């Protein structure tokens, strides 16, 4: 059965089965902070455009499987278009390198921002001024944040309406869920 374009890792079918595990480990090394494999070692299998897709596909696949904490059965469902040799190579790499991939994913999240919230304070104010005769009674939140970045604490002050505050809370809750899933 020939794999369909668009299924995860379908480009691996071009690779001889005995080279599969080696390539997968080298690509995992690459996104874990070491050197990626060189195209020149695989130029007889893929052209340079295909090679870029292979690197992206394998990286995306392993990050998704580990990030979403797929079971072996769920992973096999993703690989059902690959031949058994390639499926086995992917599963062996995944089993042996799962923790390392997870650490790389956590590192990416931490690298998004090295800034950390040190302290915060908030005040609720009621805006009573208006350019019309009727008064404007709109609650405003003043949020003071002390953010530590590169061993320096920088103060930030933000004024938000009720809607903006709700949006901030929703974003923080979503970020917290992602962090908890990765633990």
UniProtKB/Swiss-Prot annotation:
State the InterPro entries in the record: COMM, COMMD4/6/7/8, COMMD8, COMMD8_HN
Tell me which UniProt keywords the record has, alphabetically: Cytoplasm, Nucleus, Transcription, Transcription regulation, Ubl conjugation pathway
**Where is this protein found?**
Cytoplasm; Nucleus
Gene Ontology cellular-component terms for this entry are: cytosol; nucleoplasm
Q: Which residues form the signal peptide?
A: none
What is its biological role? Scaffold protein in the commander complex that is essential for endosomal recycling of transmembrane cargos; the commander complex is composed of the CCC subcomplex and the retriever subcomplex. May modulate activity of cullin-RING E3 ubiquitin ligase (CRL) complexes. May down-regulate activation of NF-kappa-B.
Instruction: Give the record's family classification.
Output: Belongs to the COMM domain-containing protein 8 family.
Q: What is this protein called?
A: COMM domain-containing protein 8
Specify the species: Mus musculus (Mouse)
The organism that produces this protein has a lineage beginning with: Eukaryota, Metazoa, Chordata, Craniata, Vertebrata
């Amino acid at each position: 059965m020939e794999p369909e374009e668009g299924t995860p890792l379908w480009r691996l079918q071009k690779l001889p089965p005995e080279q599969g595990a080696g390539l997968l480990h080298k690509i995992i090394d690459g996104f874990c902070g070491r050197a990626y494999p060189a195209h020149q070692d695989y130029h007889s299998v893929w052209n340079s455009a295909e090679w870029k897709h292979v690197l992206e596909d394998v990286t995306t696949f392993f990050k998704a499987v580990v990030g979403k904490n797929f079971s072996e059965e769920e992973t096999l469902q993703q690989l059902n278009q690959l031949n058994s040799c390639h499926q086995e190579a992917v599963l062996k790499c995944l089993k042996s390198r799962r923790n390392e991939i997870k650490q790389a994913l956590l590192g990416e999240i931490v690298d998004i921002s090295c800034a950390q919230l040190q302290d915060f304070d908030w005040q609720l104010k009621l805006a009573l001024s208006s350019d019309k005769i009727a008064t404007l009674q709109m609650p405003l939140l003043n949020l003071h944040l002390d953010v530590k970045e590169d061993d320096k604490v920088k103060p930030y002050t933000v004024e938000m309406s009720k809607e903006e505050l709700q949006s901030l809370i929703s974003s923080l809750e979503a970020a917290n869920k992602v962090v908890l899933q990765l633990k």
